[in-house]
Amino acid sequence: MSASKAMYQKLAKLAVVRGVNVQPNQPLVITASVRDYEFVRMVAKEAYAVGAREVIMSWTDTELAKLTYTYQSEETLTDIPDWKYDMVKREHDLGACYLRIHSDMPGALKDVDQSKVRAYQMAYSKKMKDLRKYTMNNEGQWCVIGIPSVEWAKVVFPHLSEEEAFEKLEDAIFMTSRVTEDSDPLENWRIHDGDLVEHARKLTELNFKQLHFTSELGTDLTVELVDNHVWIGGGDKTPKGVYFDPNIPTEECFTMPKKTGVNGIVYASKPLSYSGKVIDGFWFRFENGKVVDFGAKQEEETLKSLLNFDEGSRYLGEVALVPYDSPISNSNILFFNTLFDENAACHLALGMPYPENVKDGAHMSEEELKAAGANESSQHEDFMFGTKEMNIDGIQQDGTVVPVFRNGNFVI
């Protein structure tokens, strides 16, 4: 840590109080790299200060992951023991909240056997499928944040020394997370959330049938939205009314596309870090909601594996609007991390939708969600396609065209 300890303490408090908003006697589950133990201790201290029942750790280590994928057989990797399911089920039964701390190097697993990685991901996803709704339906609070590491910083700023790269990434993370020395991050987020909630309210009221996207990259895509869709921006609430901020940072307003209602071509505007590799220069062509053609300048086989993950991976689960004139975009930094990069540009997500994006969706069964037009998948992968010159038109139910974005920014 090169920034003052006070700055990291501010971020830790923000994550606990505003991010997951730990409640008295509620367990907090933290997923973090072993390298981040000092920051994790800060988070744990903040959690206990607000009355957390316990702090449960799920440690990760990239080097151990490489060894695991290199030396374990696929049979061993895909044999997910019942105790892992039971452990997560216990956390849910206790009403836990979840905090994930990102700091790993993008592309860290690029040299391991990707067939093993995919096999493990699919086996784990299948084992835990019925537990995913806990976070996807916001049954408990959850939040994702980022802190810098030298390994990550050198990918973002390869021409700088390790120390300079780390400090520059550190500054960028604090800035985009609205953590500063001379202000209260909790108040900063209260104001910011209010702005996003108001934008989402306006978009929901407009009740668009479709959105039409065009950009200088060649994107010409029409996305039909589900009936009774709901736009969400800023924080969210659990069924018990506990407010939390799922992403720190966030600049997006997002909703649910109709599974079979997407047509046209879309060109990604930023690379995508997926399964330990970085996919770049990629595009998709959709017909009746499904990706029917695609290409990539880098890691096309990895992109293919993403699309073939399961039956719903070639359909969209989310469409999100992010103005080009926003803190992350204005930083002109490519983070190679979806948490940050998705909040620099409009994005789409292949796979699983958020049920809350359709009216009463959190209370719907899987069949009811399907009937409403929702996609179904075990993964949710965001990719960025927003640009400086992106234009978006909203088509209302009566065919009226309403300009939504011009030259990358909101005009409503």
Where are these regions (language model features)?
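Short solvent-exposed loop/turn micro-motifs enriched in small/polar/acidic residues
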Residues: K13, T204-L206, S275-K277, G312, ...
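Short, glycine-/Ser/Thr-/acidic-enriched flexible segments
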Residues: R35-D36, D104-P106, S149, G218, ...
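Long, well-ordered mid-to-C-terminal structural blocks that present hydrophobic/aromatic surfaces
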Residues: C253-E311
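Dual-mode signal for accessory low-complexity, basic/Gly-rich regions
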Residues: V292-A362
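Extended hydrophobic packing segments that form well-structured cores
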Residues: E367-I412
